[in-house]
Amino acid sequence: PPADTLAEFIGQYVAGVAASMKRIVELIGDNSSPHDCSPNFYYFHFLSQVRMYYPGIRQKIEKIYRQDYDLWEKVIQKAKESGEIRSDTDVKKTAIMFRQMFLGLSYEQAFLNGLNVDELAENFRHIYSLLKA
């Protein structure tokens, strides 16, 4: 079921990321990398290759990004209207903070051990604590 609050949505989003990570590891394998790279690294490498060689992919990627930003904005707007978060919250900038926290951490950690989902959840909870009414 869809989340009723921003706090619930954050939990669902992190759970979705964890499930996706598990699928990536199942597809790529874990600890079998000849180059000591995390599965996340191969995922970003694959996306880079797709971006370079797949015709028309830019528009598809833009659409996927837009859908994710729209989803965050919708949930944040609802949280603002319900009084869950502060009334002076900038919905668009807040959506950007959550989304780019996820992408930035994912990219940075892809070059190390792969995305630490617990750290992502902790960072999301911190952003949420700054918004809480």
Please give the residue ranges for each predicted region.
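Helix-turn-helix
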Residues: 1
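C-terminal peripheral helix-coil segments that are non-catalytic and often amphipathic
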Residues: 12-27, 70, 74-81, 96-133
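Helical hydrophobic small-molecule/effector-binding pocket
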Residues: 8-53, 99
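Amphipathic alpha-helical packing segments from all-alpha helical-bundle domains
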Residues: 11, 15, 35-45, 55-81
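Membrane-interface starts of transmembrane alpha-helices
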Residues: 91-95
